[in-house]
Amino acid sequence: MKLLSYFILLMVAVASCSKKDNYDPPQSKLTGAILYKGDSIYLEYNRVPYQFYQYGFGKLGPVEQTFTQSGVISSLLFNGNYKFIVPNGQGPFLWPKTSGGGPDSLDVTVNGNQQLNIEVTPYYMIRNANISASGGNAVATCKVEKIINDANAKDIEFVGIYINKTEFVSGANNIANAGKSGADITDLNNISLSVAIPSLTQKYVFARIGLKIAGVEDMIFSPLVQVSF
């Protein structure tokens, strides 16, 4: 009799585990981008996180992912109500805070595939970026627009040009870079940069201009371009 009881308990436990393991995975795809007045904000790959917290499931941890280097959001979620946040200290932009100093949240209702574009205020934007090859160098020009001018304003630490053999281009992913410190930039409307292209078997590189803000960990970038030479 005891053996039969143990067997029944074992079957109940196995059935319970199987039920937990057989939930369908999330099916709803939420896509979108982080923007400033409709313009994309370009970031470093796998660098700036965002989080979804779902209502009604106790104290579960967030669903955390990172923006792409084009500032794109792409997440598979269960249908339901979520809070979307960017953690404090992340991103080259201001994210709203609560009165307690934590990151404020955006309410998001997911019901099937949908799009979510999020407007934020960056410290700076790189405008009119142009990058080309000349004399064995990648040369770039751009304009920098200062967006935040109040008590939250921050200085430019440096502006640089970055090139790489692949489409992942940043301070951490490059084969060559060169830049100017903020103190050496005299005209935000006319910034010129140049970096020597190393000897390569391929006849092109990918390039972006990046701007480092003083006191902010994450850089903001120009759109990715392919430069042939």
Locations of the language-model features?
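Short amphipathic, basic-aromatic surface patches that mediate peripheral association
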Residues: 34-40, 143-151
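Short, ordered, surface-exposed loop/turn motifs in non-cytosolic proteins
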Residues: 37-59, 153-156
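Short, acidic Ser/Thr/Gly-rich low-complexity loop/linker segments typical of extracellular
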Residues: 55-70
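Short Pro-Gly-centered beta-turn/loop motif in secreted/extracellular proteins
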Residues: 72-90
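Structured interaction patches on ligand/partner-binding surfaces of diverse proteins
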Residues: 89-121
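Beta-strand-rich modules
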Residues: 195-219
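Short beta-strand elements
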Residues: 217-229
